[in-house]
Amino acid sequence: MKGTLIFVVFYSSYGFAHCNTILRSSSLSRNFEDSLRRIPRSTDKDETGFEDSNVQEVIFILLYCLFVALAILICGLIIFYNSRKRELRANRSRGDEYLLEPTSADHKRRNSSNIVPPEPTPYPITSGESDLRQTPSRLSNVECPPELELAPINEKIMYLHYYAEVEINEEDLDISKGRPLGSGEFGIIRKGFLRSKNSKNEEKESRLEVAVKLPLNEYNQIQQELIYDELKVMCAVGKHPNILALVGGITFGERKMIVSEFVENGDLLSFLRDNRIYFTNDQWTLETEQDSLSLVDLLSFAFQIAKGMEYLIHVPCVHRDLALRNVLIKKNRIIRIADFGLARRHKNKDYYKTQSVDTPLPIHWMAPESIDKLLFTQKSDVWSYGVCLYELFSLGKSPYENVIKYDQRDFYWKYVLSYLNEGKRLAQPAHADAEIYNVMKLCWDLDMNSRTTFLDCIEFFEKELKTTSNEYFLDLTRKLRSETNNQLRLSNWLSDEKHCDS
Protein backbone atom coordinates (compact mmCIF):
# COMPACT_ATOMS: atom_id res chain seq x y z
CA MET A 1 0.00 0.00 0.00
CA LYS A 2 2.90 2.34 0.79
CA GLY A 3 4.33 1.59 -2.65
CA THR A 4 1.06 2.61 -4.25
CA LEU A 5 1.04 5.91 -2.36
CA ILE A 6 4.66 6.76 -3.32
CA PHE A 7 3.95 5.95 -6.95
CA VAL A 8 0.86 8.18 -7.08
CA VAL A 9 2.63 11.13 -5.43
CA PHE A 10 5.72 10.71 -7.63
CA TYR A 11 3.60 10.43 -10.73
CA SER A 12 1.63 13.54 -9.74
CA SER A 13 4.84 15.59 -9.15
CA TYR A 14 6.37 14.41 -12.39
CA GLY A 15 3.23 15.34 -14.30
CA PHE A 16 3.05 18.81 -12.79
CA ALA A 17 6.71 19.47 -13.61
CA HIS A 18 5.89 18.96 -17.27
CA CYS A 19 2.46 20.54 -17.13
CA ASN A 20 3.69 23.77 -18.75
CA THR A 21 5.24 21.88 -21.65
CA ILE A 22 2.02 19.93 -22.22
CA LEU A 23 -0.10 23.06 -22.16
CA ARG A 24 2.18 24.87 -24.60
CA SER A 25 2.05 21.97 -27.03
CA SER A 26 -1.75 21.91 -27.12
CA SER A 27 -4.17 24.18 -28.91
CA LEU A 28 -5.77 24.92 -25.56
CA SER A 29 -2.49 26.31 -24.21
CA ARG A 30 -1.97 28.43 -27.34
CA ASN A 31 -5.40 30.00 -26.96
CA PHE A 32 -4.71 30.46 -23.28
CA GLU A 33 -1.36 32.21 -23.94
CA ASP A 34 -2.87 34.40 -26.69
CA SER A 35 -5.46 35.59 -24.23
CA LEU A 36 -2.74 36.32 -21.72
CA ARG A 37 -0.73 38.33 -24.29
CA ARG A 38 -3.75 40.52 -24.99
CA ILE A 39 -3.79 41.51 -21.31
CA PRO A 40 -1.94 44.82 -20.94
CA ARG A 41 1.28 44.26 -19.05
CA SER A 42 2.06 46.58 -16.24
CA THR A 43 4.82 46.67 -13.75
CA ASP A 44 2.47 48.23 -11.29
CA LYS A 45 1.12 46.02 -8.56
CA ASP A 46 -2.66 45.59 -8.22
CA GLU A 47 -4.61 45.89 -5.02
CA THR A 48 -3.65 42.44 -3.87
CA GLY A 49 0.04 43.13 -4.16
CA PHE A 50 0.66 40.73 -7.06
CA GLU A 51 2.14 41.66 -10.38
CA ASP A 52 0.26 40.62 -13.54
CA SER A 53 3.28 38.60 -14.63
CA ASN A 54 2.65 36.22 -11.69
CA VAL A 55 -0.93 35.29 -12.68
CA GLN A 56 0.15 32.32 -14.76
CA GLU A 57 2.37 31.02 -11.97
CA VAL A 58 -0.50 31.28 -9.46
CA ILE A 59 -2.77 29.29 -11.78
CA PHE A 60 -0.22 26.51 -12.09
CA ILE A 61 0.23 26.40 -8.30
CA LEU A 62 -3.53 26.10 -7.79
CA LEU A 63 -3.75 23.32 -10.37
CA TYR A 64 -0.86 21.54 -8.70
CA CYS A 65 -2.54 21.70 -5.29
CA LEU A 66 -5.79 20.42 -6.80
CA PHE A 67 -4.13 17.40 -8.37
CA VAL A 68 -2.22 16.60 -5.16
CA ALA A 69 -5.48 16.69 -3.18
CA LEU A 70 -7.12 14.35 -5.70
CA ALA A 71 -4.16 11.98 -5.51
CA ILE A 72 -4.34 11.88 -1.71
CA LEU A 73 -8.10 11.25 -1.86
CA ILE A 74 -7.64 8.36 -4.30
CA CYS A 75 -4.93 6.85 -2.10
CA GLY A 76 -7.18 7.11 0.94
CA LEU A 77 -10.00 5.34 -0.87
CA ILE A 78 -7.64 2.55 -1.95
CA ILE A 79 -6.36 2.14 1.61
CA PHE A 80 -9.93 2.00 2.99
CA TYR A 81 -11.00 -0.55 0.37
CA ASN A 82 -8.06 -2.86 1.06
CA SER A 83 -8.53 -2.56 4.82
CA ARG A 84 -12.22 -3.41 4.55
CA LYS A 85 -11.43 -6.35 2.28
CA ARG A 86 -8.92 -7.76 4.79
CA GLU A 87 -11.44 -7.33 7.62
CA LEU A 88 -14.15 -9.25 5.75
CA ARG A 89 -11.69 -12.00 4.90
CA ALA A 90 -10.70 -12.25 8.56
CA ASN A 91 -14.36 -12.47 9.59
CA ARG A 92 -15.01 -15.31 7.18
CA SER A 93 -12.07 -17.25 8.48
CA ARG A 94 -12.86 -16.61 12.15
CA GLY A 95 -12.88 -19.82 14.08
CA ASP A 96 -10.14 -21.53 12.07
CA GLU A 97 -7.94 -21.53 15.15
CA TYR A 98 -10.48 -23.73 16.91
CA LEU A 99 -10.47 -26.45 14.26
CA LEU A 100 -7.73 -28.46 15.86
CA GLU A 101 -7.44 -32.10 16.69
CA PRO A 102 -7.18 -33.09 20.36
CA THR A 103 -3.65 -33.21 21.67
CA SER A 104 -2.19 -35.48 24.30
CA ALA A 105 -1.69 -32.48 26.54
CA ASP A 106 -5.40 -31.69 26.32
CA HIS A 107 -6.34 -35.24 27.26
CA LYS A 108 -3.87 -35.18 30.13
CA ARG A 109 -5.25 -31.92 31.47
CA ARG A 110 -8.78 -33.18 31.09
CA ASN A 111 -8.13 -36.47 32.81
CA SER A 112 -6.53 -34.69 35.73
CA SER A 113 -9.50 -32.37 36.15
CA ASN A 114 -11.85 -32.75 39.08
CA ILE A 115 -14.84 -32.10 36.84
CA VAL A 116 -17.09 -35.14 36.59
CA PRO A 117 -18.10 -35.56 32.93
CA PRO A 118 -21.75 -36.36 32.17
CA GLU A 119 -22.72 -39.85 31.03
CA PRO A 120 -25.74 -40.80 28.90
CA THR A 121 -28.76 -41.82 30.91
CA PRO A 122 -28.89 -45.61 31.28
CA TYR A 123 -32.33 -47.09 30.72
CA PRO A 124 -34.62 -48.25 32.16
CA ILE A 125 -34.84 -45.01 34.10
CA THR A 126 -34.68 -44.96 37.87
CA SER A 127 -34.58 -41.96 40.12
CA GLY A 128 -31.12 -42.72 41.47
CA GLU A 129 -29.30 -43.11 38.16
CA SER A 130 -26.61 -40.73 36.99
CA ASP A 131 -26.84 -38.65 33.81
CA LEU A 132 -23.10 -38.24 33.43
CA ARG A 133 -21.42 -38.71 30.08
CA GLN A 134 -18.19 -37.87 28.30
CA THR A 135 -18.87 -34.68 26.38
CA PRO A 136 -17.10 -33.94 23.08
CA SER A 137 -15.97 -30.48 24.13
CA ARG A 138 -12.66 -29.51 25.63
CA LEU A 139 -10.89 -26.32 26.54
CA SER A 140 -9.12 -24.39 23.82
CA ASN A 141 -5.39 -23.77 23.69
CA VAL A 142 -5.98 -20.68 25.86
CA GLU A 143 -5.54 -21.95 29.40
CA CYS A 144 -8.69 -21.74 31.48
CA PRO A 145 -8.16 -19.76 34.71
CA PRO A 146 -8.20 -22.00 37.81
CA GLU A 147 -11.17 -20.14 39.25
CA LEU A 148 -13.27 -21.18 36.23
CA GLU A 149 -12.33 -24.86 36.21
CA LEU A 150 -15.55 -25.91 37.96
CA ALA A 151 -17.70 -23.09 36.57
CA PRO A 152 -20.58 -23.73 34.16
CA ILE A 153 -19.58 -23.67 30.51
CA ASN A 154 -21.55 -20.43 30.15
CA GLU A 155 -18.84 -18.65 32.12
CA LYS A 156 -15.94 -19.91 30.00
CA ILE A 157 -17.21 -19.92 26.42
CA MET A 158 -14.00 -18.34 25.14
CA TYR A 159 -12.11 -21.40 26.42
CA LEU A 160 -14.44 -23.96 24.84
CA HIS A 161 -13.28 -25.84 21.80
CA TYR A 162 -14.97 -26.50 18.47
CA TYR A 163 -14.00 -29.78 16.84
CA ALA A 164 -13.18 -30.15 13.17
CA GLU A 165 -15.05 -33.45 12.89
CA VAL A 166 -18.43 -31.72 13.20
CA GLU A 167 -17.67 -29.23 10.42
CA ILE A 168 -20.10 -29.59 7.50
CA ASN A 169 -19.41 -28.72 3.89
CA GLU A 170 -21.91 -26.00 3.00
CA GLU A 171 -22.25 -27.48 -0.49
CA ASP A 172 -23.81 -30.60 1.07
CA LEU A 173 -26.53 -28.57 2.80
CA ASP A 174 -29.78 -27.53 1.09
CA ILE A 175 -31.65 -24.85 3.06
CA SER A 176 -35.36 -24.32 2.50
CA LYS A 177 -36.37 -20.87 1.29
CA GLY A 178 -39.92 -21.23 2.56
CA ARG A 179 -41.44 -20.24 5.87
CA PRO A 180 -38.86 -20.41 8.68
CA LEU A 181 -39.32 -22.86 11.53
CA GLY A 182 -38.70 -20.07 14.01
CA SER A 183 -36.80 -16.88 14.68
CA GLY A 184 -35.32 -15.04 17.62
CA GLU A 185 -33.54 -11.85 18.56
CA PHE A 186 -30.38 -12.77 16.66
CA GLY A 187 -31.05 -15.89 14.60
CA ILE A 188 -33.52 -17.58 12.29
CA ILE A 189 -34.18 -21.33 11.99
CA ARG A 190 -34.95 -22.98 8.66
CA LYS A 191 -35.53 -26.53 7.58
CA GLY A 192 -32.76 -28.13 5.56
CA PHE A 193 -31.50 -31.36 4.06
CA LEU A 194 -27.98 -32.64 4.57
CA ARG A 195 -26.69 -34.82 1.75
CA SER A 196 -24.31 -37.69 2.33
CA LYS A 197 -23.02 -40.56 0.22
CA ASN A 198 -23.41 -43.98 1.72
CA SER A 199 -20.02 -45.36 2.75
CA LYS A 200 -20.92 -48.76 1.26
CA ASN A 201 -22.27 -47.38 -2.00
CA GLU A 202 -20.81 -44.05 -3.09
CA GLU A 203 -23.33 -43.80 -5.93
CA LYS A 204 -26.23 -43.81 -3.51
CA GLU A 205 -26.91 -40.44 -1.92
CA SER A 206 -29.05 -40.11 1.21
CA ARG A 207 -30.55 -37.00 2.74
CA LEU A 208 -31.09 -36.15 6.38
CA GLU A 209 -33.77 -33.71 7.54
CA VAL A 210 -32.16 -31.06 9.72
CA ALA A 211 -32.87 -27.68 11.30
CA VAL A 212 -30.44 -24.90 10.40
CA LYS A 213 -29.92 -21.85 12.62
CA LEU A 214 -28.41 -18.82 10.89
CA PRO A 215 -27.80 -15.20 11.90
CA LEU A 216 -30.60 -12.82 10.97
CA ASN A 217 -28.03 -10.59 9.29
CA GLU A 218 -25.04 -12.44 7.89
CA TYR A 219 -23.06 -9.17 7.76
CA ASN A 220 -23.58 -8.49 11.48
CA GLN A 221 -20.42 -9.59 13.26
CA ILE A 222 -22.12 -9.72 16.67
CA GLN A 223 -24.80 -12.10 15.40
CA GLN A 224 -22.11 -14.26 13.79
CA GLU A 225 -20.30 -14.48 17.13
CA LEU A 226 -23.52 -15.35 18.98
CA ILE A 227 -24.20 -18.22 16.58
CA TYR A 228 -20.61 -19.44 16.93
CA ASP A 229 -20.78 -19.27 20.73
CA GLU A 230 -24.05 -21.22 20.76
CA LEU A 231 -22.44 -23.79 18.48
CA LYS A 232 -19.59 -24.26 20.94
CA VAL A 233 -22.06 -24.56 23.82
CA MET A 234 -23.95 -27.31 21.98
CA CYS A 235 -20.67 -29.11 21.34
CA ALA A 236 -19.95 -28.93 25.05
CA VAL A 237 -23.42 -30.10 26.07
CA GLY A 238 -23.21 -33.33 24.09
CA LYS A 239 -26.10 -35.73 23.48
CA HIS A 240 -28.98 -36.79 25.71
CA PRO A 241 -32.42 -38.06 24.63
CA ASN A 242 -34.07 -34.97 26.13
CA ILE A 243 -31.59 -32.44 24.70
CA LEU A 244 -31.64 -31.27 21.08
CA ALA A 245 -28.80 -33.06 19.29
CA LEU A 246 -26.18 -31.21 17.29
CA VAL A 247 -25.50 -32.68 13.85
CA GLY A 248 -22.71 -30.28 12.92
CA GLY A 249 -21.77 -26.71 12.17
CA ILE A 250 -20.55 -24.47 9.38
CA THR A 251 -17.82 -21.99 10.30
CA PHE A 252 -15.85 -21.59 7.06
CA GLY A 253 -18.58 -19.94 4.97
CA GLU A 254 -19.68 -16.33 4.78
CA ARG A 255 -22.03 -16.99 7.71
CA LYS A 256 -21.91 -19.27 10.71
CA MET A 257 -24.59 -21.98 10.96
CA ILE A 258 -25.77 -24.52 13.52
CA VAL A 259 -27.12 -27.75 12.03
CA SER A 260 -29.22 -29.78 14.48
CA GLU A 261 -31.70 -32.62 14.30
CA PHE A 262 -35.14 -31.80 12.90
CA VAL A 263 -38.01 -32.22 15.37
CA GLU A 264 -41.20 -32.65 13.39
CA ASN A 265 -43.91 -31.48 15.83
CA GLY A 266 -42.34 -28.13 16.64
CA ASP A 267 -42.37 -26.46 20.03
CA LEU A 268 -44.28 -27.90 22.96
CA LEU A 269 -46.15 -24.66 23.71
CA SER A 270 -47.78 -24.57 20.27
CA PHE A 271 -48.45 -28.31 20.47
CA LEU A 272 -50.40 -27.90 23.72
CA ARG A 273 -52.40 -24.97 22.42
CA ASP A 274 -53.23 -26.73 19.16
CA ASN A 275 -54.37 -29.90 20.96
CA ARG A 276 -56.39 -28.40 23.82
CA ILE A 277 -59.62 -29.64 22.29
CA TYR A 278 -58.32 -33.23 22.36
CA PHE A 279 -57.40 -33.21 26.04
CA THR A 280 -58.87 -36.01 28.11
CA ASN A 281 -58.38 -37.47 31.57
CA ASP A 282 -59.23 -40.97 30.38
CA GLN A 283 -56.88 -43.82 31.23
CA TRP A 284 -54.06 -44.10 28.70
CA THR A 285 -53.45 -47.36 26.80
CA LEU A 286 -51.20 -48.37 23.91
CA GLU A 287 -54.28 -48.11 21.68
CA THR A 288 -54.93 -44.48 22.62
CA GLU A 289 -55.30 -42.28 19.54
CA GLN A 290 -52.20 -40.39 18.47
CA ASP A 291 -54.01 -37.04 18.38
CA SER A 292 -55.30 -37.31 21.93
CA LEU A 293 -53.71 -35.49 24.84
CA SER A 294 -54.06 -36.81 28.36
CA LEU A 295 -52.90 -36.03 31.87
CA VAL A 296 -50.29 -38.78 31.66
CA ASP A 297 -48.78 -36.97 28.67
CA LEU A 298 -48.37 -33.84 30.79
CA LEU A 299 -46.73 -35.88 33.54
CA SER A 300 -44.39 -37.38 30.95
CA PHE A 301 -43.41 -33.97 29.60
CA ALA A 302 -42.71 -32.68 33.12
CA PHE A 303 -40.63 -35.77 33.86
CA GLN A 304 -38.61 -35.51 30.64
CA ILE A 305 -37.87 -31.79 31.02
CA ALA A 306 -36.59 -32.43 34.54
CA LYS A 307 -34.39 -35.26 33.19
CA GLY A 308 -32.89 -33.00 30.56
CA MET A 309 -32.25 -30.18 33.01
CA GLU A 310 -30.68 -32.54 35.55
CA TYR A 311 -28.32 -33.66 32.80
CA LEU A 312 -27.33 -30.04 32.11
CA ILE A 313 -26.37 -29.63 35.77
CA HIS A 314 -23.68 -32.27 35.32
CA VAL A 315 -22.26 -30.73 32.12
CA PRO A 316 -22.42 -28.15 33.83
CA CYS A 317 -24.57 -25.65 31.90
CA VAL A 318 -27.10 -23.02 32.96
CA HIS A 319 -29.81 -22.72 30.30
CA ARG A 320 -31.17 -19.27 31.31
CA ASP A 321 -34.16 -19.44 28.94
CA LEU A 322 -36.12 -22.55 29.88
CA ALA A 323 -39.69 -22.18 28.60
CA LEU A 324 -42.05 -24.41 26.63
CA ARG A 325 -41.42 -22.34 23.50
CA ASN A 326 -37.85 -23.64 23.70
CA VAL A 327 -38.86 -27.26 24.24
CA LEU A 328 -39.48 -29.31 21.09
CA ILE A 329 -41.63 -32.42 20.76
CA LYS A 330 -41.29 -35.37 18.41
CA LYS A 331 -44.15 -37.39 16.97
CA ASN A 332 -43.52 -40.12 19.53
CA ARG A 333 -44.02 -37.57 22.37
CA ILE A 334 -40.32 -37.44 23.30
CA ILE A 335 -39.23 -33.89 24.09
CA ARG A 336 -36.00 -32.06 23.35
CA ILE A 337 -34.77 -29.03 25.29
CA ALA A 338 -33.43 -26.57 22.75
CA ASP A 339 -32.27 -22.99 22.18
CA PHE A 340 -29.04 -22.39 24.06
CA GLY A 341 -28.81 -18.86 22.65
CA LEU A 342 -29.15 -17.30 26.10
CA ALA A 343 -26.86 -19.87 27.68
CA ARG A 344 -23.94 -17.54 26.93
CA ARG A 345 -23.18 -14.57 29.16
CA HIS A 346 -25.00 -11.65 27.55
CA LYS A 347 -23.16 -8.33 27.70
CA ASN A 348 -26.20 -6.12 27.21
CA LYS A 349 -28.09 -5.93 30.50
CA ASP A 350 -30.98 -4.11 28.83
CA TYR A 351 -31.60 -7.25 26.79
CA TYR A 352 -33.13 -8.79 29.90
CA LYS A 353 -34.53 -5.69 31.56
CA THR A 354 -36.85 -4.71 28.73
CA GLN A 355 -39.31 -1.90 29.26
CA SER A 356 -41.96 -3.37 26.95
CA VAL A 357 -44.31 -6.25 27.76
CA ASP A 358 -44.70 -6.83 24.02
CA THR A 359 -41.07 -7.86 23.61
CA PRO A 360 -40.77 -11.68 23.67
CA LEU A 361 -38.07 -11.84 26.33
CA PRO A 362 -38.08 -14.28 29.27
CA ILE A 363 -39.05 -11.89 32.07
CA HIS A 364 -42.01 -14.08 33.09
CA TRP A 365 -39.78 -17.15 33.33
CA MET A 366 -36.88 -15.51 35.15
CA ALA A 367 -36.17 -15.83 38.86
CA PRO A 368 -36.20 -12.63 40.95
CA GLU A 369 -32.42 -12.66 41.36
CA SER A 370 -32.07 -12.96 37.59
CA ILE A 371 -34.35 -9.98 36.95
CA ASP A 372 -32.83 -7.82 39.67
CA LYS A 373 -29.14 -8.77 39.66
CA LEU A 374 -28.76 -10.74 36.41
CA LEU A 375 -27.71 -13.72 38.52
CA PHE A 376 -28.23 -16.96 36.59
CA THR A 377 -27.62 -20.31 38.26
CA GLN A 378 -29.00 -23.83 38.24
CA LYS A 379 -31.43 -22.60 40.90
CA SER A 380 -32.73 -19.90 38.56
CA ASP A 381 -33.33 -22.66 36.00
CA VAL A 382 -35.39 -24.45 38.67
CA TRP A 383 -37.59 -21.34 38.97
CA SER A 384 -38.07 -21.35 35.18
CA TYR A 385 -38.98 -25.04 35.35
CA GLY A 386 -41.79 -24.17 37.75
CA VAL A 387 -43.18 -21.72 35.19
CA CYS A 388 -42.94 -24.48 32.58
CA LEU A 389 -45.09 -26.66 34.84
CA TYR A 390 -47.67 -23.87 34.89
CA GLU A 391 -47.63 -23.80 31.08
CA LEU A 392 -47.97 -27.58 30.93
CA PHE A 393 -50.88 -28.05 33.31
CA SER A 394 -52.75 -25.01 31.98
CA LEU A 395 -52.38 -26.38 28.42
CA GLY A 396 -50.33 -23.47 27.18
CA LYS A 397 -51.60 -20.41 29.03
CA SER A 398 -49.26 -17.42 29.20
CA PRO A 399 -47.93 -16.80 32.72
CA TYR A 400 -49.06 -13.61 34.48
CA GLU A 401 -51.39 -12.71 31.62
CA ASN A 402 -54.08 -11.49 34.03
CA VAL A 403 -51.85 -9.44 36.32
CA ILE A 404 -50.58 -6.86 33.82
CA LYS A 405 -51.79 -3.37 34.63
CA TYR A 406 -51.84 -0.75 31.92
CA ASP A 407 -50.19 1.88 34.11
CA GLN A 408 -47.33 -0.52 34.86
CA ARG A 409 -46.36 -1.17 31.23
CA ASP A 410 -43.33 1.13 31.46
CA PHE A 411 -40.38 -0.52 33.20
CA TYR A 412 -42.43 -3.70 33.28
CA TRP A 413 -39.60 -5.77 34.70
CA LYS A 414 -39.73 -3.66 37.89
CA TYR A 415 -43.42 -4.41 38.27
CA VAL A 416 -42.88 -8.16 37.83
CA LEU A 417 -40.05 -8.07 40.39
CA SER A 418 -42.21 -6.17 42.88
CA TYR A 419 -45.07 -8.62 42.30
CA LEU A 420 -42.85 -11.60 43.10
CA ASN A 421 -41.15 -9.99 46.10
CA GLU A 422 -44.58 -9.45 47.65
CA GLY A 423 -45.00 -13.22 47.71
CA LYS A 424 -47.52 -13.37 44.87
CA ARG A 425 -47.30 -16.37 42.56
CA LEU A 426 -49.01 -17.91 39.57
CA ALA A 427 -52.35 -19.51 40.37
CA GLN A 428 -52.89 -23.26 40.46
CA PRO A 429 -53.53 -24.38 36.85
CA ALA A 430 -56.68 -26.31 35.99
CA HIS A 431 -55.06 -29.69 35.41
CA ALA A 432 -52.61 -29.68 38.33
CA ASP A 433 -53.63 -31.25 41.62
CA ALA A 434 -52.49 -29.95 45.01
CA GLU A 435 -49.32 -32.07 45.03
CA ILE A 436 -48.21 -30.88 41.59
CA TYR A 437 -48.95 -27.27 42.53
CA ASN A 438 -46.89 -27.71 45.68
CA VAL A 439 -43.91 -28.76 43.52
CA MET A 440 -44.41 -25.60 41.50
CA LYS A 441 -44.37 -23.44 44.63
CA LEU A 442 -41.19 -25.19 45.81
CA CYS A 443 -39.60 -24.04 42.55
CA TRP A 444 -40.62 -20.44 43.30
CA ASP A 445 -39.06 -19.93 46.73
CA LEU A 446 -37.52 -16.45 46.99
CA ASP A 447 -34.55 -18.02 48.75
CA MET A 448 -32.77 -19.72 45.87
CA ASN A 449 -31.04 -22.16 48.22
CA SER A 450 -34.41 -23.36 49.53
CA ARG A 451 -35.81 -24.27 46.13
CA THR A 452 -36.39 -27.86 45.15
CA THR A 453 -33.98 -29.67 42.83
CA PHE A 454 -34.43 -31.27 39.42
CA LEU A 455 -33.59 -34.63 40.97
CA ASP A 456 -36.49 -34.21 43.41
CA CYS A 457 -38.77 -33.31 40.50
CA ILE A 458 -37.64 -36.41 38.59
CA GLU A 459 -38.48 -38.63 41.55
CA PHE A 460 -41.87 -36.97 42.02
CA PHE A 461 -43.04 -37.21 38.41
CA GLU A 462 -41.63 -40.72 37.98
CA LYS A 463 -43.79 -41.80 40.90
CA GLU A 464 -46.80 -39.96 39.45
CA LEU A 465 -46.27 -41.62 36.07
CA LYS A 466 -46.03 -45.11 37.51
CA THR A 467 -49.10 -44.54 39.67
CA THR A 468 -51.17 -43.11 36.83
CA SER A 469 -50.09 -45.59 34.14
CA ASN A 470 -47.15 -47.92 34.63
CA GLU A 471 -47.76 -49.16 31.09
CA TYR A 472 -47.14 -45.63 29.79
CA PHE A 473 -43.96 -45.34 31.83
CA LEU A 474 -42.56 -48.61 30.46
CA ASP A 475 -43.38 -47.48 26.92
CA LEU A 476 -41.65 -44.16 27.60
CA THR A 477 -38.58 -46.04 28.82
CA ARG A 478 -38.38 -47.98 25.57
CA LYS A 479 -38.77 -44.81 23.51
CA LEU A 480 -35.99 -43.01 25.40
CA ARG A 481 -33.66 -45.94 24.87
CA SER A 482 -34.45 -45.85 21.15
CA GLU A 483 -33.84 -42.09 21.03
CA THR A 484 -30.39 -42.60 22.52
CA ASN A 485 -29.53 -44.90 19.61
CA ASN A 486 -31.02 -42.45 17.10
CA GLN A 487 -28.79 -39.67 18.36
CA LEU A 488 -25.74 -41.90 18.04
CA ARG A 489 -26.69 -42.46 14.40
CA LEU A 490 -26.66 -38.68 13.89
CA SER A 491 -23.01 -38.66 14.95
CA ASN A 492 -22.26 -41.54 12.60
CA TRP A 493 -23.84 -39.60 9.72
CA LEU A 494 -20.93 -37.16 9.55
CA SER A 495 -18.44 -39.94 10.22
CA ASP A 496 -19.73 -41.88 7.20
CA GLU A 497 -19.59 -38.74 5.07
CA LYS A 498 -16.00 -37.99 6.01
CA HIS A 499 -15.09 -41.64 5.46
CA CYS A 500 -16.45 -41.37 1.92
CA ASP A 501 -14.56 -38.13 1.28
CA SER A 502 -11.30 -39.73 2.35
From Swiss-Prot:
Cytoplasmic side: 80-502
Reactions this protein catalyses: L-tyrosyl-[protein] + ATP = O-phospho-L-tyrosyl-[protein] + ADP + H(+)
Record's subcellular location: Cell membrane
Residue intervals annotated with topology Extracellular: 20-58
Keywords: ATP-binding, Cell membrane, Kinase, Membrane, Nucleotide-binding, Signal, Stress response, Transferase, Transmembrane, Transmembrane helix, Tyrosine-protein kinase
Source species: Caenorhabditis elegans
Record's bilayer topology term: Single-pass type I membrane protein
One Gene Ontology CC term in the entry: plasma membrane
Protein name stated in the entry: Tyrosine-protein kinase receptor old-1
A Pfam family reported for this protein in Swiss-Prot or TrEMBL: PK_Tyr_Ser-Thr
Family, per entry: Belongs to the protein kinase superfamily. Tyr protein kinase family.
Signal peptide from the UniProt entry: 1-19
E.C. numbers: 2.7.10.1
Purpose: Receptor tyrosine kinase which plays a role in promoting longevity and resistance to stresses including UV irradiation and high temperatures, probably downstream of daf-16.
Gene Ontology molecular function, alphabetical: ATP binding; transmembrane receptor protein tyrosine kinase activity
TM region(s), chain numbering: 59-79
Region (Disordered): 99-140
PANTHER family for the chain: PROTEIN KINASE DOMAIN-CONTAINING PROTEIN-RELATED, TYROSINE-PROTEIN KINASE RECEPTOR
Database matches in InterPro entries: Kinase-like_dom_sf, Prot_kinase_dom, Protein_kinase_ATP_BS, RTK, Ser-Thr/Tyr_kinase_cat_dom, Tyr_kinase_AS, Tyr_kinase_cat_dom
Binding-site list for ATP: 181-189, 213
Disulphide bridges, residue numbers: none
Gene name, Swiss-Prot/TrEMBL: old-1
Keyword Transferase carried by entry: yes
Gene3D superfamilies hit by this protein: Phosphorylase Kinase, domain 1 (3.30.200.20), Transferase(Phosphotransferase) domain 1 (1.10.510.10)
Catalytic residues (UniProt): 321 (proton acceptor)
Null mutant phenotype: Increased life span and resistance to UV irradiation and high temperatures.
Biased composition (Polar residues): 127-140
Induction and repression of expression: By UV irradiation, high temperatures, starvation and old age.
